[in-house]
Curated annotation (Swiss-Prot):
Family per record: Belongs to the FGGY kinase family.
Binding-site positions, ATP: 17-19, 265, 308, 312, 409
Protein's pathway: Polyol metabolism; glycerol degradation via glycerol kinase pathway; sn-glycerol 3-phosphate from glycerol: step 1/1
Pfam families: FGGY_C, FGGY_N
Binding site for glycerol: 87-88, 139, 243-244
EC number assigned by the record: 2.7.1.30
Protein name: Glycerol kinase
Organism: Pseudomonas putida (strain ATCC 700007 / DSM 6899 / JCM 31910 / BCRC 17059 / LMG 24140 / F1)
Biological-process GO terms, alphabetical: glycerol catabolic process; glycerol metabolic process; glycerol-3-phosphate metabolic process
Signal peptide (residue range): none
Alphabetized UniProt keyword annotations: ATP-binding, Glycerol metabolism, Kinase, Nucleotide-binding, Transferase
Domain of life: Bacteria
Length: 499
């Protein structure tokens, strides 16, 4: 706890995949200052994605200065700083100079596909799943780190001599902000590395041995809400969470069975499972979330590959809408989709199908089908895919969803939100505060330093702007969903491949 009596603001740093942002909140959790800076994406080969860690730090530092200036406040008025970040992205740097030995390898980067294939051939897949809650995939940090050690000249030897440090983006930023004094991460970010035992809450020696990672490179793992250190200007760094877990906390989904969906290019669904690390039989990830006081809780996570990107396809490739915002108007012009289903399996199907060979398709076309029906079917596909994942979550954990809390760009679409409630048969709650990811980091930092007293105070600030209640009867709902399931089956295993 720190004395926050005269300090009336919390800064949240939201370090994302394409931009760095800073958002300043007051005691009522209102936004009083913001700044955002984009940075370069590097694509050295097909399927490879990199960022410059120094540019990430520079843009993130600049946004903090700019947000403070916009709000007209000084560092001395800030009680604490919370960090939320793109997860899995991997940085390795020299402990003495603070210079990265290679660009940050981004979560989207697929360069370690062959490393993952070798892990599977060597029979490690089951142990990885059991220990980390994750699947053996290039998405996660461990194989990215192995690639750097194997491919950057001298990196492995330097790491073994204790000269190099590893971190996800939160760790890198904190190390830089504290002038190299603090090398730390939180449980949520550690749980995405493929090196962390989510049951013992320790780095896993067997996994480090399998991947060939020297343990001394790794940061200390701490709870998501505590004071880790101070910036050079004296601000307490007091909260860390990966972006999706931060949004879950920002939505106050801290009890078992509470869930949120972030509607972006794809959709990220997380359901809090409390102190139970639920093993999924539907290919969902088991991950660490934040409990009521920022302590360890568990969650199930599932991703929908194509959400907002389906609407972008209507706009950019089919050119049947000029603006994503127009889809609500066109979808509402017709009473239903006229039997049309769009399955947007452009890059295969994610949870719970896991079919990389599925391909997108339109079903139910007749001469009576208009553009409006196709636009409506595209929006409905986002809601159907969300139900696919939530049904799997409910089956895995035996918890009935109480309500779905939503955030992300597409939640402004009232048609989509209403249809989501209809097809789930569950209330959908849209918060007044849309900055839920940054808010989660601010809450974690504010709780750690006594800026806010506890969960009850935070719940009072969680104003629901609109609640969408289900309006379809059970028979109608299940008939529509059965049509979706039938359409999905027809898209399965479409692309030719070797068995």
């Amino acid at each position: 706890m720190t004395d926050t009596q005269d300090k009336n603001y919390i800064i949240a740093l939201d370090q994302g995949t394409t931009s760095s942002r800073a958002i300043i909140f007051d005691r009522d959790a209102n936004v009083v200052g913001t700044s955002q800076r984009e940075f370069a994406q590097h694509y050295p080969q097909a399927g490879w994605v990199e960022h410059d860690p120094m540019e990430i730090f520079a843009t993130q530092s600049a946004t903090m200065v700019e947000a403070l200036a916009q709000a007209g406040i000084s560092h001395a008025q800030v009680a604490a700083l919370g960090i939320t970040n793109q997860r899995e992205t991997t940085v390795v740097w020299d402990k003495e100079t603070g210079r990265p030995v290679y660009n940050a390898i981004v979560w989207q980067c697929r360069r370690s596909t062959e490393i993952c294939a070798q892990l599977k051939r060597d029979g490690h897949e089951g142990y990885i799943r059991e220990t980390t809650g994750l699947v053996t995939d290039p998405y996660f940090s461990g194989t990215k780190l192995k690639w750097i050690l194997d491919n950057v000249d001298g990196a492995r030897e330097r790491a073994e001599r204790g000269e190099l440090l590893f971190g996800t983006i939160d760790t890198w930023l904190i190390w830089k902000f504290t002038g190299g004094k603090v090398h730390v991460t939180d449980y949520t970010n550690a749980s995405r590395t493929l090196m962390f035992n989510i049951h013992s809450l320790q780095w896993d020696d067997k996994l480090l041995q399998i991947l060939g990672i020297p343990r001394q490179m790794l940061p200390e793992v701490r709870p998501s809400s505590e004071v880790y250190g101070h910036t050079k200007s004296g601000i307490a760094i007091a909260g860390i969470a990966g972006d999706q877990q931060s949004a879950l906390f920002g939505q106050m989904c801290v009890e078992p069975g509470q869930a949120k969906n972030t509607y972006g290019t794809g959709c990220f669904l997380l359901m809090n499972t409390g102190d139970q690390a639920v093993k999924s039989s539907h290919g969902l990830l088991t991950t660490i979330a934040c409990g009521p006081r920022g302590e360890v809780a568990y969650a199930l996570e599932g991703a929908v590959f194509n959400g907002g990107s389906t609407v972008q396809w209507l706009r950019d490739e089919l050119k049947i809408v000029n603006d994503a915002l127009d889809t609500e108007y066109f979808a509402s012009k017709v009473k239903d989709s006229n039997g049309v289903y769009l399955v947007p399996a452009f890059t295969g199907l994610g949870a719970p199908y896991w079919d990389p060979y599925a391909r997108g398709a339109l079903f139910g076309l007749t001469r009576g089908v208009k553009v409006d029906h196709i636009i409506r079917a595209a929006l409905e596909s986002i809601a159907y895919q969300t139900r696919d994942v939530l049904d799997a979550m409910q089956q895995d954990c035996g918890q009935r969803l109480s309500e779905l809390r939503v955030d992300g760009g597409a939640v402004a679409n009232n048609f989509l939100m209403q249809f989501q409630a209809d097809i789930l048969g569950t209330c959908v709650e849209r918060p007044q505060m849309r900055e839920t990811t940054a808010l989660g980091a601010a809450y974690l930092a504010g709780l750690a330093c006594g800026f806010w007293s506890g969960l009850d105070e935070l719940r009072d600030k969680a104003i629901i702007e609109r609640e969408f209640s289900p309006q379809l009867d059970e028979t109608q709902k299940e008939k529509l969903y059965a049509g979706w399931k039938k359409a999905v089956e027809r898209t399965r295993d479409w692309e030719d491949h070797e068995a």
